């Protein structure tokens, strides 16, 4: 589905790079501009991702006709082809749904004015210190007529947006603490109050950008050329590199090794894949032979929830937010805390009592028409997406593994499925993978390339991007469940 936006209305300023990085092939005037004394920015880094070799991304984008259409749609709608889009190129079915949903949230008719939408995106991304997304939406905020003074800090924004800060904070880091009192405080704030429709729009935006921050860090997305950290004015050290090389597959810089398993023998990582395949086969046989009781499955959930508290990285250090990002939110010390740490007990969220399909979907669609359907489609695509491959193996049913990943994320948020045996999680997800999952979902600003490289070492980069799509959609659904349940309780 083509995005409904005229190309001649596109915002082209941020990514008009072909002129800046001109060459004989694309018609630009690099040499001429330099002779005139114009400082010409050149991209830092080696492509859209710091974790994935550029040539793998560009190869996929150049071979798939569907991708060309999606790229044209994205550029027409946003005036740019950002690095997130380029990394999602591995999974065109998901990318199409993602772009369609994001376009609707930001640009189509809805309860919130356009500049509010981008400012909320800034607030949400800033909670995870995601300067990449903050920079993108600062530009968009100004383009749609936002007041530059608001960008000096949240205290300079309208009180109505300042009031949203508490919900943003809790939703990003400890969504299980959200109550109907949070909702009531926003809906009954006298002249600064939110309508229910506005609040649902805001909640969807917050959860969308919290999750997108996870994808940004989880895939090592590089800064855009027009943003801080994305360019240099120094002469190129290897050869003149032009943006037009993206379209013809030329590369002028050395690529990272294709295999992400650094310092690990091929045989070791091969046996890891074989062991995982064998565990999946054994679990399927156990499923067919006997089924655990409800009491046993409830006990296994509690065990897994407790164990998830002790999954952390050896690199787990506090990251101090830069002032350029931290000014967009309050209480910078507030962050993720494990579900049941310090003896605090929060009741388990049972999906059988409140779920997206039966409750959240209809509430969103009622207050913000069509968005529920778009989000639901995106959830289903991410959850069911499969190419029936695992590393070098083909014709593999990966549904068991995908469900374990999804349910592990929800388990970390205290969300339980009565019909799932949580004993499968420890069988299928090893410690390095759990560390990566928890970091991407809970504290994405702490993700490192070492974490990315250390899990599923024999798997393709496209499969790791697929994992990140599962992580961000499971996270978004978990946040939505807590927020929408609180709204439902307020309404009843």
Swiss-Prot record:
Induction info: Isoform T2 and isoform T3 are induced by genotoxic stress (UV, gamma-irradiation and cytotoxic drugs) in a p53/TP53-dependent manner. Isoform T1 is not induced by p53/TP53.
Binding-site list for L-leucine: 386-389, 398, 463
Tissues and organs where the protein is expressed, per its UniProt entry: Widely expressed.
Record-level Gene Ontology MF annotations: L-leucine binding; oxidoreductase activity, acting on peroxide as acceptor
Superkingdom of source: Eukaryota
Function: Functions as an intracellular leucine sensor that negatively regulates the TORC1 signaling pathway through the GATOR complex. In absence of leucine, binds the GATOR subcomplex GATOR2 and prevents TORC1 signaling. Binding of leucine to SESN2 disrupts its interaction with GATOR2 thereby activating the TORC1 signaling pathway. This stress-inducible metabolic regulator may also play a role in protection against oxidative and genotoxic stresses.
GO annotations of cellular component type: cytoplasm; cytosol; fibrillar center; nucleoplasm; nucleus
Residues recorded as bearing Phosphoserine in the entry: 293, 314
UniProt record similarity statement: Belongs to the sestrin family.
Record field: catalytic activity: a hydroperoxide + L-cysteinyl-[protein] = S-hydroxy-L-cysteinyl-[protein] + an alcohol
Protein name, UniProt field: Sestrin-1
Subunit organization: Interacts with the GATOR2 complex which is composed of MIOS, SEC13, SEH1L, WDR24 and WDR59; the interaction is negatively regulated by leucine. Interacts with RRAGA, RRAGB, RRAGC and RRAGD; may function as a guanine nucleotide dissociation inhibitor for RRAGs and regulate them. Interacts with KEAP1, RBX1 and SQSTM1; in the SQSTM1-dependent autophagic degradation of KEAP1. May interact with PRDX1.
Result when mutating residue 130 to S: Loss of the ability to decrease intracellular reactive oxygen species
Subcellular location: Nucleus; Cytoplasm
Active site: 130
Annotated region (N-terminal domain), positions in chain: 71-252
The record's note on its domains: The N-terminal domain may have an alkylhydroperoxide reductase activity.
GO BP, sorted A to Z: cellular oxidant detoxification; cellular response to amino acid starvation; cellular response to glucose starvation; cellular response to L-leucine; cellular response to leucine starvation; negative regulation of cell growth; negative regulation of TORC1 signaling; positive regulation of macroautophagy
EC number from the UniProt entry: 1.11.1.-
Region of interest: C-terminal domain: 321-492
Lineage: Eukaryota, Metazoa, Chordata, Craniata, Vertebrata
Organism: Homo sapiens (Human)
């Amino acid at each position: 589905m083509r995005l409904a936006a005229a190309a001649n209305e596109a915002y082209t300023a941020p990514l008009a790079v072909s002129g800046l990085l001109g060459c004989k092939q694309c018609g630009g005037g690099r040499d001429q501009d330099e002779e005139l004394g114009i400082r010409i920015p050149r991209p830092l880094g080696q492509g859209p991702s710091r974790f994935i070799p550029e040539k793998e991304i560009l190869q996929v984008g150049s071979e798939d006709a569907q991708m060309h259409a999606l790229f044209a749609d994205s550029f027409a709608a946003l005036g740019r082809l950002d690095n997130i889009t380029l990394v999602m190129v591995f999974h065109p079915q998901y990318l199409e749904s993602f772009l369609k949903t994001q376009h609707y949230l930001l640009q189509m008719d809805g309860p919130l004015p356009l500049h509010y939408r981008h400012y909320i995106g800034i607030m949400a991304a800033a909670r995870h210190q995601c300067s990449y997304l903050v920079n993108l939406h600062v530009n968009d905020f100004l383009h749609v007529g936002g007041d530059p003074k608001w960008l000096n800090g949240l205290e300079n924004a309208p009180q109505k947006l300042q009031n949203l800060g508490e919900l943003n904070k809790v939703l990003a880091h400890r969504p299980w603490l959200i109550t109907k009192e949070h909702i009531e405080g926003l809906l009954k704030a006298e002249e600064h109050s939110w309508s229910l429709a506005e609040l649902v729009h805001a909640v969807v935006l917050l959860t969308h950008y919290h999750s997108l921050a996870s994808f940004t860090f989880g895939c090592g997305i590089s800064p855009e050329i027009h943003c801080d950290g994305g360019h240099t004015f120094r002469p190129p050290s290897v050869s003149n590199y032009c943006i037009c090389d993206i379209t013809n597959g030329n590369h002028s810089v050395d690529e990272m090794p294709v295999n992400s398993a650094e310092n690990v023998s091929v045989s070791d990582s091969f046996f890891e894949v074989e062991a995982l395949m064998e565990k999946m086969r054994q679990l399927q046989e156990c499923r067919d032979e006997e089924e655990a009781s409800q009491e046993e499955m409830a006990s296994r959930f509690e065990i897994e929830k407790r164990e998830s508290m002790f999954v952390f990285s050896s690199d787990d250090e506090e990251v101090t937010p830069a002032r350029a990002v931290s000014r967009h939110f309050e209480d910078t010390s507030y962050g993720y805390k494990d579900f049941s740490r310090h003896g605090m007990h929060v009741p388990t969220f049972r999906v059988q009592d409140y779920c997206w399909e039966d409750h959240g979907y209809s509430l969103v669609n009622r207050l913000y028409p069509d968005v529920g359907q778009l989000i639901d489609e995106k959830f289903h695509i991410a959850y069911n997406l499969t190419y029936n491959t695992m590393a070098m193996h083909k014709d593999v049913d990966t549904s068991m593994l995908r469900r374990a990943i999804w349910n592990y994320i929800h388990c970390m948020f205290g969300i339980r499925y009565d019909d799932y045996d949580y004993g499968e999680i420890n069988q299928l997800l090893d410690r390095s993978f759990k560390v990566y999952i928890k970091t991407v979902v809970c504290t994405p600003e702490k993700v490192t390339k070492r974490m990315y490289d250390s899990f599923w070492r024999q798997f393709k980069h496209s499969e790791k991007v697929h994992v990140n799509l599962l992580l961000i959609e499971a996270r978004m659904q978990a946040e939505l469940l807590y927020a929408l349940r609180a709204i439902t309780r307020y309404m009843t």
